[in-house]
Amino acid sequence: MWGPAGLTDTLVELGILTPELAPRMAKGGTIHPIGPDIAITQVHAEHSSEFIYVNPETTKREVHVGGEPVGFIIKLENGFTIYHMGDIGLFGDLTLIGPRYRPDLLLIPIGGHFVMNPSEAAYATKELIKPKMAWPMHYASNPLLKGTPAEYKAALGQSSTQVIDAKPGDKKTF
């Protein structure tokens, strides 16, 4: 499992993964896990990052280090680029990530409370990242995540970004 070093270290320490299955990765690092033409780059993000584990011996929940928060830029062999933002809040590095990686598809949280709300997500989409397409995520999975795709679209207003309408379990081809 490629992920932030702190998270992979925690998973190894708890015995969930073996060291061979948990290679370390750091922000700014790029890997080519399935060949030279597909690249995954770990980028900075802003959100909490902990790993909740139910100890099988005590049956109690434990909070462990989850590693630094990150997002992922995935560049496919045809050049199509995806930016998975994760549980992100609006932050300044988005002004660098958008122009540097120029994602075709943005997977963007819109639910609010733990992540950006629809208005903040629309600002990040339209003013900072400027993707061709955006796929709203991290909404309606928790009562506190009240933002909706309709609110995101309304906040986005006139934009060249196409918003992907999808429900959990939907599949899309690009």
Pin down the residues of each PLM region.
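Metallo-beta-lactamase
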Residues: 64-122, 127-129, 137, 141-143
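Phosphate- and divalent-cation-binding pockets in alpha/beta enzyme and binding domains
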Residues: 9-13, 93
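Short, polar loop motifs at secondary-structure junctions
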Residues: 4-10, 26-29
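Binuclear metal-ion centers of metallo-dependent hydrolases, dominated by the metallo-beta-lactamase
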Residues: 15-19, 23-34, 120-174
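Glycine/Thr-rich phosphate-binding loops of Rossmann-like dinucleotide-binding domains
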Residues: 11, 50, 116, 144
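Divalent metal-coordination and catalytic microenvironments
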Residues: 1, 40, 87, 106, ...
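Short internal beta-strands
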Residues: 1-7, 133-138
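Core dinuclear metal-dependent hydrolase active-site scaffold
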Residues: 24-99, 168-174
